[in-house]
């Protein structure tokens, strides 16, 4: 008899994401496009289970306050669940590297050869993966997220962190 893994509770998910407008830096159309796609993809498919909160679904407000990343987690009816403040220090170098390579990527797609674009994109994805793993580590014991959810959240954190 084979064992099947337990099915994830479909209530352990985000149904809405809000980015704090005061936290969002000026950005160009490429960054705005990344943000819109990340929010759409995140809401479409995610695993998000705050420790000890029971099931959701949840809404998430993300902000930068001081030198901290704030995750304000609420139920769908806006009842508060928990607010987590995470230091931005572990993300600073990763976000800086991510945006440097994103700038190179956006320039390359206009003029470079397909091989050059692919090489830059592989580097971009590698840095993005590093940021996603760092976020999963920082959320460990607070909120359970799968890797794809962490990737989309890292994109949103990067948008907030980017100051144009």
From Swiss-Prot:
Indicate the family of this protein.
Belongs to the UPF0262 family.
HAMAP family on file: UPF0262
Q: What is this protein called?
A: UPF0262 protein Nham_0287
């Amino acid at each position: 008899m084979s064992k099947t893994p337990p099915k994830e509770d479909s209530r352990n998910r985000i149904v809405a994401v809000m980015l704090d407008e005061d936290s969002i830096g000026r950005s160009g159309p490429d960054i705005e496009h990344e943000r819109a796609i990340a929010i759409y993809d995140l809401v479409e498919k995610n695993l998000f289970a705050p420790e000890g909160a029971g099931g959701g679904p949840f809404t998430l407000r993300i902000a930068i306050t001081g030198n901290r990343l704030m995750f304000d987690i609420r139920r769908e009816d806006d009842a508060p669940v928990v607010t987590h403040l995470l230091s931005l220090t572990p993300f600073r170098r990763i976000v800086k590297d991510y945006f440097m390579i994103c700038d190179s990527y956006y320039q390359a797609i206009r003029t470079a050869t397909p091989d050059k674009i692919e090489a830059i994109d592989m580097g971009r994805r590698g840095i993005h993966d590093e940021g996603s793993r760092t976020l999963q580590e920082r959320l460990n014991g607070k909120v359970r997220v799968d890797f794809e959810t962490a990737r989309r959240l890292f994109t949103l954190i990067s948008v907030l962190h980017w100051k144009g």
